[in-house]
From Swiss-Prot:
It comes from Arabidopsis thaliana. Residues 21-92 form the KH type-2 domain. This is Small ribosomal subunit protein uS3x. CDD domains: KH-II_40S_S3. Transmembrane segments: none annotated. It holds the Pfam family KH_2.
Amino acid sequence: MATQISKKRKFVADGVFYAELNEVLTRELAEDGYSGVEVRVTPMRTEIIIRATRTQNVLGEKGRRIRELTSLVQKRFKFPQDSVELYAEKVANRGLCAIAQAESLRYKLLGGLAVRRACYGVLRFVMESGAKGCEVIVSGKLRAARAKSMKFKDGYMVSSGQPTKEYIDAAVRHVLLRQGVLGLKVKIMLDWDPKGKQGPMTPLPDVVIIHTPKEDDVYIAPAQVVTQAAFVPEAPLTTTDYPAMPVA
């Protein structure tokens, strides 16, 4: 017998489930370019779509890795048998995915690359991928014992209002280095895309679109054909026409 719960409890339960699932997959698939998860609940089963840059590593050899993840999720969240299905979806453009770039920056720093060089590399790659703006913030013990933050920006970035929810893709990651923990924050501003593939379909509120004027139709009057009147010679004047006319 299905238990009845209020709408508020249902939303809270769904939010907690999504947060825990995202945390589990972030730890398991960090090295495989994990970029987010989407949960679709159908009457028959629950579908979980994992977005990653390297989907082949997520699937594993002959689908072994994805089956292990399915079993893990099923036992962790107590799903009935064969009621949950996991799929792997490749990220179309990883340069416009903040989570993928934050993970990339994290592994660059773990590999010993300088902070400034790693951040500028991420910044350049994001802008070359078609983003409208990008911001990278690294905070922690960067050089000296005193903690500080470094901010790298390029392009155009909005910071308030509804466009921040539609246009800004942000991600936060932490990396443990020898001097301590560094915090990494990547913000990417997408560009307006009427098709909705590379960015939001709704334009920014302050964007003014100037359309090219239409060409004026030039009215050409039909040519008039002037026909020359036929010359009719006049008859010579006579006394009949003018009786008072003297006769030469």
